[in-house]
Amino acid sequence: PHAGDKIKGSGSGSMQIQYGTKSDLRMYGNYAIQDGIYNFSLQQLIHKDFKIREGSLISFNGDPFNANMDINAIYNLTANLSDLDQSLALESPRTNVPVNCVLLLDGMLRQPNISFDLELPGSNEELERQMKSLIDTDDMMTRQIIYLLVLNKFYTPEYTGQNSNDFT
């Protein structure tokens, strides 16, 4: 996690902990998170609590700060799909839909790899596929996540605002 980010959770696992007066703390084993919160912060702009999905895992192999993470967490909101692209409004009976902003953390606890994804729970697979075809790069996914977390709306790419009258 980054400075200011926090993980709180409960779970279970088979752990071995070693500590002596002349040695550093050592931890071994896997801890499966059953319920928890990842407090995500980005500079002074975003502070959101993502719900950690059951089955997320922290694996310890000695130094607790070198633990490996495989954490999947979501932040739920409602957003208007037509902000992303007007054609998506044709695919759904309603344009305000539930959206899961998905935070994926893997790698070492000290320097995790962070990536994002989006889900449309309750929507059909075709609608989600179309949404993801519009968000086809990591940069665009990150931009969409930031807009959703800050403004509760999708980022509208510049090309969607153009029409044939703009050209001379």
Put a short name on every predicted segment.
Residues 1-157:
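Strand-loop-strand
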